[in-house]
């Protein structure tokens, strides 16, 4: 780049001199020719770039990666603002105007590098004398140049009136403010490096330095905007730097107020850490990495640090260094309750506690139903009524038929009351309530649509797997459809598990099987009446007929005297029909043989 620009410049100058053959006509020809001026501008920019690299080597040595990144980032914004300034001052556009803006951008770059290099002093433990010499020489040179250009702009405005020098005067005044802040930071860092122990008040001085310089920048930008609007036009190129200056000043004010509040809370609200607390925990302060023997404070989050370390920390941020808890919010005292709030709290305590319905006893090894709302796809269902034919309440006592019937009656009354009190009861023949009776009324379009089940459940084929591989739109849609199918299957499985557990809870544990004696009575009535053997007569009028839905029936009363006279006082046993018939036939044959 350097060689090409140098060759182009030499060729242009040689061509102009070849045409004019004299120095003055050659200079006039170069200044009037647009292509020649463009090549000369390029050569001037190359020379400025080379001068900047040389001065960077002299004052900074090797630039760090962070410094180069910040320089490039700020340079792009500065070039954009310079182009906007060219549009505002298009009437004053000239080679001298371009040279002044180029020089301003050149000096801005060195101001930014000086600021980054001084900030590096706080993170570097070893600072050489060469570093101090370079920084002091650079700050002295930049300060002298800023003061010179400010005085030059002032004299130009006084003698010639409002011109483009107004912009350069305010720009160099702001650069003077920046170099002043850099110099104060350099002094503070140098004092801190010379002391053996960390300087606690350095953060305080740096905070007030930023507050002071930020206030000066805001005043300068406001004055510059006011003057430019009155004498020329609205300075569009100054909007971004003025906004950044105001934001920085606002941040400095907020940091100053919040840091003072945090330090006041630390001195008044936070207790000192005792020796037992220091021994019970790791007594190394994570801010300075030194052991805490005395002079430690315990924050509301129970983390302990040096008091001096906390004071320096709170100058920048008001959070716990370990857990990032906001110490200002945690330190707010509780507000006393007003009489109205106390009365409302007293009334809330006097209100009766709502009675929670008892949970049903689930069989061993079974899980209770899932709570409503766990799966948002399915709305919560109402209370399930007992399944028809299932025992209600406790199982009846076989030894006490009266208590069984009484408990059955009470259970029936309870079920009637429950069915009246719950509108979402199940319809006859259905073990579950209707889906829309046991749930609250939703707003329009409030119920999500039921998803369509997947086409198959045997797994994904090779074609479906290949359809999901890739990063195109159809591959993404295939993966989303697969996830939707999985979500549908999981919701359906959870619903069926909930229904299954509800049915198990309603039917209760299994009861021992009890056979009915009605079949034996029917078989006894079919025996021939011409037999000479006296068959046992059962008093059917005293049999209590029970409903088929009940699991246990009352004992059937029989004529014990008749049975005793015929069979020697034996009580009939509940046996199957074929065994009873066989026994009776054997008795009949034995009676016939004896006669």
Curated annotation (Swiss-Prot):
Zn(2+) 1 binds at residues 285, 288, 306, 309. The chain crosses the membrane at residues 1-19, 36-56, 93-113, 130-150, 164-184, 219-239. Pathway: Protein modification; protein ubiquitination. Pfam families: zf-RING_2. It is a multi-pass membrane protein. It catalyses: S-ubiquitinyl-[E2 ubiquitin-conjugating enzyme]-L-cysteine + [acceptor protein]-L-lysine = [E2 ubiquitin-conjugating enzyme]-L-cysteine + N(6)-ubiquitinyl-[acceptor protein]-L-lysine. Residues 354-370 have a biased composition (Pro residues). It is found in: Endoplasmic reticulum membrane. Residues 335-370, 386-426, 509-595 are annotated as: Disordered. Its EC number is 2.3.2.27. Residues 20-35, 114-129, 185-218 are lumenal. One of its GO terms (biological process) is ERAD pathway. PROSITE patterns: ZF_RING_2. GO terms for molecular function: ubiquitin protein ligase activity; zinc ion binding. Residues 335-353, 390-408, 514-552 have a biased composition (Low complexity). A zinc finger (RING-type) spans 285-324. Residues 230-264 are annotated as: Interaction with p53/TP53. Zn(2+) 2 binds at residues 301, 303, 320, 323. Residues 57-92, 151-163, 240-595 are cytoplasmic. Its main location: endoplasmic reticulum. The RING-type zinc finger is required for E3 ligase activity. E3 ubiquitin-protein ligase which accepts ubiquitin specifically from endoplasmic reticulum-associated UBC7 E2 ligase and transfers it to substrates, promoting their degradation. Component of the endoplasmic reticulum quality control (ERQC) system also called ER-associated degradation (ERAD) involved in ubiquitin-dependent degradation of misfolded endoplasmic reticulum proteins. Also promotes the degradation of normal but naturally short-lived proteins. Protects cells from ER stress-induced apoptosis. This is E3 ubiquitin-protein ligase synoviolin B. It comes from Xenopus laevis (African clawed frog). The lineage of its organism: Eukaryota, Metazoa, Chordata, Craniata, Vertebrata. The gene is syvn1-b.
């Amino acid at each position: 780049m350097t060689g090409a620009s140098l060759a182009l410049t030499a060729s242009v100058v040689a061509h102009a001199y070849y045409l004019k053959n004299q120095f003055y006509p050659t200079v006039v020809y170069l200044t009037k020719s647009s292509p020649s001026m463009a090549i000369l501008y390029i050569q001037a920019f190359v020379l400025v770039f080379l001068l900047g690299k040389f001065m960077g080597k002299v004052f900074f040595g090797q630039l760090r990666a962070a410094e180069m990144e910040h320089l490039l980032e700020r340079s792009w914004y500065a070039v954009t603002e310079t182009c906007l300034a060219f549009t505002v001052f298009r009437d004053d556009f000239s080679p001298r105007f371009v040279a002044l803006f180029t020089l301003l951008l050149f000096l801005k770059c060195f101001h930014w590098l000086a600021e980054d290099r001084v900030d590096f002093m706080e993170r570097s433990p070893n600072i050489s004398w060469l570093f101090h010499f370079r920084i002091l020489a650079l700050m002295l040179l930049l300060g002298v140049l800023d003061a010179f250009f400010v005085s030059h702009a002032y004299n130009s405005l006084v003698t010639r009136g409002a011109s483009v020098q107004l912009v350069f005067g305010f720009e160099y005044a702001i650069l003077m403010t920046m170099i002043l802040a850099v110099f104060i930071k350099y002094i503070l860092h140098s004092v801190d490096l010379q002391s053996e122990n960390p300087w606690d008040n350095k953060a305080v001085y740096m905070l007030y330095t930023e507050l002071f310089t930020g206030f000066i920048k805001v005043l300068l930008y406001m004055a510059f905007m006011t003057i430019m609007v009155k004498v020329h036009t609205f300075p569009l190129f100054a909007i971004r730097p003025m906004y950044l200056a105001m934001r920085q000043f606002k941040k400095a004010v907020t940091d100053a107020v919040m840091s003072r509040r945090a330090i006041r809370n630390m001195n008044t609200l936070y207790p000192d850490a005792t020796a037992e607390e220091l021994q019970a925990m790791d007594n190394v302060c994570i801010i300075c990495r030194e052991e805490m023997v005395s002079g430690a404070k315990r924050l509301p989050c129970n983390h302990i640090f040096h008091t001096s370390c906390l004071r320096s920390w709170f100058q920048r941020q008001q959070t716990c260094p370990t857990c990032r808890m906001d110490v200002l919010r945690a330190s707010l005292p509780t507000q006393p309750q007003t009489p109205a709030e106390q009365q409302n709290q007293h009334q809330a305590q006097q209100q009766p506690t709502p009675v929670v319905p008892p949970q049903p006893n689930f069989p061993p090894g079974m899980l209770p139903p899932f709570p409503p709302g766990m799966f948002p796809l399915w709305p919560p269902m109402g209370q399930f009524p007992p399944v028809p034919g299932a025992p209600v309440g406790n199982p009846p006592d076989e030894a006490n038929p009266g208590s069984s019937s009484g408990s059955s009656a009470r259970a029936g009354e309870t079920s009637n009351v429950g069915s009246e009190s719950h509108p979402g009861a199940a319809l006859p023949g259905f073990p579950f309530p209707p889906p829309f009776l046991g749930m609250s009324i939703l707003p329009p379009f409030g119920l999500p649509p039921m998803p369509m089940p997947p086409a198959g459940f045997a797994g994904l084929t090779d074609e479906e797997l290949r359809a999901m591989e890739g990063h195109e739109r159809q591959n993404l849609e295939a993966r989303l459809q697969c996830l939707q199918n999985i979500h549908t299957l999981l919701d359906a499985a959870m619903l069926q598990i909930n229904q299954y557990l509800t049915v198990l809870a309603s039917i209760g544990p299994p009861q021992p099987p009890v056979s009915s004696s009605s079949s034996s009575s029917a078989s006894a009535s079919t025996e021939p009446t011409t037999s000479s053997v006296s068959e046992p007569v059962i008093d059917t009028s005293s049999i209590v007929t029970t409903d088929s839905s009940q699991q246990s029936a009352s004992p059937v009363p029989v004529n014990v005297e008749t049975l005793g006279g015929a069979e020697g006082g034996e009580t009939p046993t509940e046996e199957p029909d074929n065994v009873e018939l066989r026994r009776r036939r054997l008795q009949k044959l034995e009676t016939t043989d004896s006669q």
